[in-house]
Amino acid sequence: MMQKLAKEIYNWCQSKGLWGDNIIYFNGKAWSSNPTWSGEKGKEIADELYEYEDRNPLDYFEYANPKTLSMSFEGALYEALNAWDLPCYDGTEEELQGIFKKYDLYWEFGNAWNLSAYEL
């Protein structure tokens, strides 16, 4: 279920121009927009999407939920979720919550640059 959610988040970000400097953590792995991570080359699984094994979000930020899905972001997604008062981003947060809700989850910020999923 988490991989399906991760794929939907990735597709949504791509369609909105929000994919870049993002990492989605789930099931002990990470999907990143970056082709390398500390010198390790990721396995390319889609356009600008690289998979890394053995990644725990708690190793990278304090407010993470390795039991579901966590995500860190900079760039366009960071701006969209934190500059919500700009007209060009109207509804972005609600759209993303809607994706999580389909999986009986909701997300909340840990810091301004990361979020984690929790059961409804």
Regions found by a protein language model. Give the residues of each.
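Positively charged, hydrophobic/aromatic-enriched amphipathic segments
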Residues: 1-50
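Acidic, low-complexity, intrinsically disordered interaction modules
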Residues: 32-110
